């Protein structure tokens, strides 16, 4: 097993807390803080393959032995083919500009616009209090892994941006937010499609979407990015899945995506 995975495990502790996704449940969460650590691309691949997620320096992994409802999901980018509805999203966004930025470059050019967009997204989607510039920067622009920022411009305006980890063979979405006025363009779906396309063009193998949780409608869009693989924490192996989960769990959910943590 890769030494870096052992290193994260060695620094981690199991904390029992109210589950973020199922508040009626007290769940054990593996947590670690990787202060002042720089991960190599290979180490990033490894932590993703082992089911870890992170926000800034904080790494976490839901691994409840009696639950198994929070399953890491990834897409083999060479096998992905957009569905009919996803092709319609691409057609609708023919004039939408998609770019990838290094975090520093993006911050210098767009961080104030990005923060304003992010706070509108939090308010409309979740009724959450706004973040200040320092909180926003520390949460998304500081990372032990190499990070990229995916950006959408519609009619010259910043319409959405997402933060991603880049490994040697992997691209992993951390968080995506968009300006609610552009909801009709399906920016969450469009950004996923373009990020997968970028991953394929750059020779990557996997695109990680965080957790797939069958019972949470806001996460069911992940089951529509097919084919996908789910991590079995019990065996430590990724299992290929074609379409049944996506069809069964998304049929009655709203088409709008709510991309965020998880």
What do the PLM-derived regions correspond to, one by one?
Residues 26, 123-126, 243:
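Short linear sequence elements within intrinsically disordered, low-complexity coil regions
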Residues 1-85, 262:
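Intrinsically disordered, low-complexity, positively biased terminal segments
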Residues 71-78, 206-262:
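Active-site/acyl-donor-binding loops of N-acyltransferases
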Residues 98-99, 128-129, 187-190, 197-200, ...:
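Glycine-rich loops and low-complexity Gly/Arg-rich segments
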Residues 58-67, 72-184, 224:
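A conserved beta-strand-loop-helix scaffold within acyl/acetyltransferase catalytic domains
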Residues 80-92, 196, 232-240:
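Short, basic, helix/turn surface patches
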Residues 16, 23-49, 54, 113, ...:
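Acyl-donor binding region in acyl/amide transferases
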């Amino acid at each position: 097993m890769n030494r870096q995975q052992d290193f994260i495990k060695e620094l981690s502790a199991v904390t029992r807390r109210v589950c973020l996704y199922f508040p009626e449940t007290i769940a054990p969460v593996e947590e670690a803080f990787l202060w002042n650590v720089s991960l190599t691309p290979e180490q990033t691949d490894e932590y993703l393959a082992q089911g870890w997620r992170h926000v800034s320096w904080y790494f976490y992994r839901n691994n409840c032995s009696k639950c198994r409802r929070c399953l890491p999901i990834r897409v083999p980018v060479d096998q992905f083919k957009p569905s009919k509805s996803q092709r319609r999203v691409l057609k609708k966004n023919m004039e939408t500009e998609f770019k990838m930025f290094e975090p520093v470059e993006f911050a210098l050019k767009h961080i104030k616009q990005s923060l304003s967009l992010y706070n509108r997204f939090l308010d409309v989607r979740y009724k959450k209090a706004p973040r200040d510039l320092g909180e926003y920067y520390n949460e998304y622009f500081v990372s032990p892994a190499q990070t990229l920022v995916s950006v959408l411009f519609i009619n010259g305006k910043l319409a959405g941006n997402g933060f991603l980890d880049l490994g040697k063979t992997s691209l992993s979405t951390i968080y995506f937010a968009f300006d609610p006025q552009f909801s009709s363009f399906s920016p969450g779906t469009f950004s996923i499609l373009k990020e997968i396309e970028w991953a394929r063009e750059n020779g990557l193998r996997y695109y990680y979407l965080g957790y797939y949780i069958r019972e949470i409608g806001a996460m069911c869009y992940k089951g529509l990015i097919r084919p996908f693989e789910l991590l079995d924490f019990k065996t430590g192996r990724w299992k290929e899945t074609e379409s049944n989960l996506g069809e069964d769990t998304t049929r009655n959910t709203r088409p709008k995506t709510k991309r965020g943590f998880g």
